[in-house]
Every structure is written in structure tokens, then in C-alpha cells.
Amino acid sequence: MEGIIFGDLSTLPDLLSSLSPYKVVVLTNTTLKELWLEEVLTWLKEFKPQTIVVPDGEKYKDLDTVRYIWEKLLEMGFTRRSLLIGLGGGVITDIAGFVASTYMRGTYLGLVPTTLLAQVDAAIGGKTGINFYGKNIIGTFYLPKFVLICRDFLKTLPMVEILNGLAEVVKYGILDKEVYNAIKTMNSPREIVEREDIIKKSVAVKLRIVEEDLKENGKRRVLNLGHTVGHAIEKISDYKIKHGFAVSMGLVVEAKIGEILYGFDSGKVVEILTKFGLPVKIPFDPYTTLQAMKIDKKAWYGKIVIVVPVEIGKANIEEVDEKIILQALEEAKNA
């Protein structure tokens, strides 16, 4: 797991010393500013860090926010040999990665993910993105110099954020038997905070796949399990439905497609999601959801591409007939 560090904030000075950055800027949001920024800055004081604070929320993951950050970096004299640290959840890590990859054609990037979702998914693997008429329509692939995964952040997370990230862990469980068996031993969502073994297993699954296919030309697409439907649900809700909750619903639909095509037991997915209190019913009209799925960067030649589970530990990436998708959406709406 090169570049992925499991530790506490006291490791930050050594991480930065190895880079010798010209300037250090911490990008965070209004919520994290009150909760964690002061402590992080204390550990970075020898590097004289500056900060950029943006509003909290998925709807701010757009070009306006990126433009604001670019302008602030220019004002600060930020250079290619300077370090941008993204301190926050998936929105912040996505924005920080995109800004770092585009500003002066690439600067140093470090990520300190503060949510379960970011620690197991958004901050891992080098994907960056902003929303533009759809989820992550504009983005790059750009690897950070480091990702610091600190369990202390999870201890202060509200339950809604634990659940938001747990959906991605369940996704890894469908793709990997070892993660699936570990999840089955959990009795409540908050157990994940103390189960660093499950977090490490989830990260390892993603890294193993990403190392084979960084730029998502082939195998990496399996990590989009639940996301073709999930992104459509987020879009229809105007991002009022959190990413993990949308992915949870997407996992159910795509599991049902697997059931139709391959006899996959979708009940296993529904059972785990229900045990943790994650949503399994689609709240929107199936046809509306289907149309939203067509505005998707994973589409091939205008065709909807789905990650279809065949069995626990195995999934196919394939075009799926719209009639089958509608059938699965209907079943999930009435589940």
C-alpha cells in the first residue's frame, strides 16, 4: 500500500519533510474548519501552512468552487513544487485532486480523508472529479503523494456519515469474499470505527484493482458496482440524497440485474444493507431513473453499462438491455 498511511496526525510532519514543499495550503470546508482544522494546522506549524475554506456539500463540487481555489492559490504564490492538502470527505478529496492535477499542470497533492466514505473509496486510487450536468463529468486521474488514514476522524462522525461510507464497504464485500465474510461478523454500523481490519481490507481490494488499471480502461470499472444507478439517483435528487445512500439503492438494482441474468442471490445484498439500516428501495419512477442513467461517463457508444454481480467475489462489466434494467428498477422500487 505505497502512499497509503494508516496512522494519526502526528505523522504529518515527517510526510511533509520528505517532500520539502515550497508552500503548504490546506483545503477544507466550513464544517471541518470548526472540527479539525486547528489541530491539523498545529501539526503543520513548522511549514507555515495557509488555508482555503469552501462551503460544505456536494452541490459545491463544481467549476465555480474550483475557479475560486485556483484564484486563491495564485494570490498565495502557490507553485508546482507546493503541496495542496485536501482535509475532508469525498467532496474535498475530489476537488483537491482536480485542482492539484490542473493548476500549473500538476502540483504536489496530499489527502487527509475525514469520513469513512473518503477513507475507503474517494481518496483511494487517483480519481478526481467535479460535477457538470452530471456526477463527476469533468475529472482527471492524479495520484497523491500520500493519503493519511486516521481512525480518530471516524470516532466523531455522525451515524449518517458512517452509513454513507458503509455502503461502499458493502460494495467491496460483493466484489471480494474476504470483505464479505468480515462484514457479516458486524452487528451494528458503528462497529466499523473499531474494525480497522475491514477498512484495510476494503482499501486493499481497491488498490489491487487500481494497480492493474489506473485509468479505468478495463478491470477498474468493476469498482463502479452500484454507481451507474447510484449516480442517476443522486442527479435526480439534485444531490440531496447522499452518495452512499444512492449507491446502496444502486447495489440492490444491480444485484437484481445479476439475479435476472445469472441467478445471483440479490437477497444477500438486501439482507446486509437492511441490517445496517441502509436504503434498499428506489424512491423515483423507474423510467425517470433509466433516462438519468444514460448521462453517465461509463456509457459505451450510448449504451448503458452496468457492473453485474455473478456471485460474491465476481462481477461482469456489460451492456444491459433497457427492459432488464427497468424490470430491476421496478423490483427495487417495490421491494
From Swiss-Prot:
GO cellular component entries: cytoplasm
SUPFAM superfamilies to which the protein is assigned, alphabetical: Dehydroquinate synthase-like
Subcellular location: Cytoplasm
UniProt cross-references to Pfam families, sorted A to Z: DHQ_synthase (PF01761), DHQS_C (PF24621)
Superkingdom: Archaea
Residues annotated as binding NAD(+): 56-61, 90-94, 114-115, 127, 135, 153-156
Cofactor or coenzyme needed: NAD(+); Co(2+); Zn(2+)
Binding annotation for Zn(2+): 168, 227, 243
Primary role: Catalyzes the conversion of 3-deoxy-D-arabino-heptulosonate 7-phosphate (DAHP) to dehydroquinate (DHQ).
Family membership: Belongs to the sugar phosphate cyclases superfamily. Dehydroquinate synthase family.
Protein name: 3-dehydroquinate synthase
